[in-house]
Amino acid sequence: MTCPIVTGVTKACRDSKGGLTTIYVTEHSNLIQASITSASGILTNVATFLNTGKKFWTIEVEMNVGNEIETINSDRPTGTTAYAQALNFYIPKKQASIAQWVMTLAQNDLAFIVLDKNGYYRLLGQKYGMGMTGSTAPSGTNMTGEQSGYVLSFAGEEPVLANEMSAALVAAVLVAA
């Protein structure tokens, strides 16, 4: 076999937390693909991998309304594997400024950095980008307990699972060059 298993997995503490705390977005075309380096699932860049003057923009998400899901799709007969990436989050309050922002996102191929509740950053849409899919802007019916805003969903497909990023690298790509 050409893909030997070289390590095992030990049982971890039961302290993992689900959900996202912060999301960052940029146009996929802002990434300089040739300058993105990784090893063992972690980006190894020590400086930004964005075009000059570009940055990731912050999206603050409410508690328990954002998640990312990676689905491993392997086809034994063809010997191929791909990794579907999905990002979902909710922005409350329907308003003109957010509607314009949402329409801009819908028109672009995007890359996202997500920060999960365990303190890990991951880069989504690294090679091929992600696009908006199946998003809605519900008004809700009741005064409380229902969403009134933008329920946004993005999907992409990548050759590897999302790479982790260090906090230092995230700080570098958040600063406008």
For every predicted segment, state its role.
Residues G79, V102-T104, I113-V114, N142-E146:
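A general structural signal for short secondary-structure junctions and capping/turn motifs
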Residues C3-P4, K11-N88, M130-T144:
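Solvent-exposed edge beta-strands and adjacent loop segments
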Residues M63-V65, Q85, Y90-Q95, V114-N118:
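Generic secondary-structure microfeatures
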Residues A96-M103, N163-M165:
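Short, conserved charged micro-motifs
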Residues V102-G125:
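Short, acidic/charged, Gly/Pro-enriched secondary-structure junctions
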Residues P77-A96, E146-V160:
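Oligomerization/assembly interface segments of phage tail-like spikes and tubes
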Residues N30, G66, K94-A96, G119-Y121, ...:
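Generic "edge-of-domain/loop-turn" microfeature
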Residues G129-A177:
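Mixed-charge, glycine-accented linear interaction segment located at domain edges/termini
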